[in-house]
Amino acid sequence: MKDIRIAIDGPASSGKSTVAKIIAKNLGYTYLDTGAMYRSATYLALQNGLTEENVPEILDQLSQNPISFGKAADGSPKVYVGDVDITHPIRDNQVTNNVSWVAAIPEVRQELVSQQQRIAQEGGIIMDGRDIGTVVLPDAELKIFMIASVDERAERRYKENIEKGIPADLETLKKEIAERDYKDSHREVSPLRPAEDAITFDTTGVSIDGVVEFIQEKAKKIIDKG
């Protein structure tokens, strides 16, 4: 048996993070939330009043406040910039609606990708994001590209927000997700697209358990081959 690298890509609210966390726990792998890293960079930019015109300053903030991951007492993941816990603030709508322009800055992506690649060198890791299989881990042993309808993804985000006590409007979420899809798939740097050797999986109408089972079966076949 060997520890492999699993890359899960897909558009906003396609269920990537939820599935990746469960699989990481089941396989005893490390879960690296790349989306949280870009959200953290966005959070730092917004907190300091920075825009796409302030790239050097954003890079300075990332250097002064390194992003790290930890675990809460119940095992749930925590995200920090410096020593500040920003696990919940980075999920706010303001961060969500600004992350695309931050993630499109080449220098920011380059810095975060190099950090992700270093962490993944040993294997036994699962990452989810927009360009894991195409840019971050092009040689990952398993690549999955998850998709789902805009309506279903908006419903998922709506339920998540309500459960977390975040105000939400379903029609607004549908519009925001459709706009995010367009931005992510049309940006010049690392546009959202499946890797040539990725398995595309439409999760519309499929339960979380069903998605987890599908991906784990693929992973175990590769692991067992050694």
From Swiss-Prot:
InterPro entries: Cytidylate_kin, Cytidylate_kinase_dom, P-loop_NTPase
Binding-site positions, ATP: G10, P11, A12, S13, S14, G15, K16, S17, T18
Gene Ontology MF terms: ATP binding; CMP kinase activity; dCMP kinase activity
One CC-aspect GO term: cytosol
Protein name, per record: Cytidylate kinase
The protein's Enzyme Commission number: 2.7.4.25
The keyword Kinase is assigned to this record: yes
Keywords: ATP-binding, Cytoplasm, Kinase, Nucleotide-binding, Transferase
